[in-house]
Regions:
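Surface-exposed loop/turn and secondary-structure junction residues enriched for glycine/proline
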Residues: 7, 26, 31-34, 38, ...
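A cross-kingdom marker for long, charged
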Residues: 141, 145-262
């Protein structure tokens, strides 16, 4: 409740008036109706989740498989994870052309707000819940590798989702990343961004906003994309299990073992 709506605690004066006002807001009422209508039938998502969680269970035998729910959050957090359950904010997956999105989100945000990515975000949310980030959140390398691990595993679990879709990129942007991977990596190294604990700089690499501080063509979240390439290299070099992949927490050691050469 409180975490979803950004409301005060029930003890605060006027709390219930605030709740009533929130849910009476016309835009939210329309959003709720549209979301319930869009997700009246979810067989496609159930089938994807069945395959995806079966893959996770095969590779993480001790992992508990959560009960999966849906909710309307009013454009708040995409996925909520709690003990043995996950809930997806379906109002964030209405399709990039959904009219209400036009006033609230940029193009680079709307491209991710697709029904086809719902199952992927369930899986990513659960992996993050089961294997929370334990590095230094201000160090780019730590964040890149962690986010890259999540993308790598979700793509293995749901291979029908293309890497470009999983990143929230247009195909042309993904192809640009592939063609410019070496230049991107060299730029990060030359600017000494990889190991320097700088929260502001690190967050720029992981924001959905286009990374124009690197070049005009660089799409957003480029840190995650490069992290994914490092993880792919690590898995080719080490033939590790996915459990070993998630348990390797030392990012510098991981990079060394990956022998990443874009």
């Amino acid at each position: 409740g409180k975490g979803i709506l950004n409301l005060q605690s029930p003890e605060v004066s006027g709390f219930f008036d605030q709740v009533i006002a929130y849910y009476s807001e016309p835009t939210l009422k329309n959003l709720y109706k549209d979301a319930v209508r869009e997700y009246d039938h979810v067989t496609d998502i159930e089938n994807q989740l069945g395959k995806g969680f079966a893959f996770l269970k095969a590779n993480f035998p001790n992992m508990q498989i959560p009960a999966c729910y849906m909710h309307v959050s009013g454009f708040n957090q995409n996925v909520l994870a709690a003990d043995s359950l996950l809930s997806l904010s379906i109002d964030k997956y209405m399709g990039e052309a959904y009219p209400l999105y036009q006033d609230f989100f940029y193009d680079y945000q709307r491209i991710k707000m697709q029904r086809t990515l719902a199952a992927a975000d369930y899986l990513a949310g659960w992996l993050m819940s089961e294997y929370p980030f334990e590095g230094n959140e201000n160090i780019l390398l730590d964040r890149m590798i962690y986010e890259g691990k999540i993308k790598y595993i979700v793509h293995l679990a749901l291979p029908e989702i293309t890497p470009a879709q999983l990143m929230g990129y247009q195909e042309k942007d993904y192809e640009w990343c592939v063609a410019n991977e070496l230049t991107l990596w060299n730029t990060i190294i030359q600017r000494k961004h990889l190991y320097t604990p700088d929260q502001i700089t690190t967050s720029k690499y992981l924001d959905d906003k286009p990374c124009t501080f690197l070049s005009d063509e660089t799409p957003g979240n480029i840190g995650t994309w490069i992290g994914w390439q490092i993880v792919s290299s690590y898995m080719k070099e080490n033939n590790a299990s996915l459990q070993t992949l998630m348990q390797q927490q030392n990012a510098q050691e991981f990079l060394s073992q990956a022998k990443y050469k874009p």
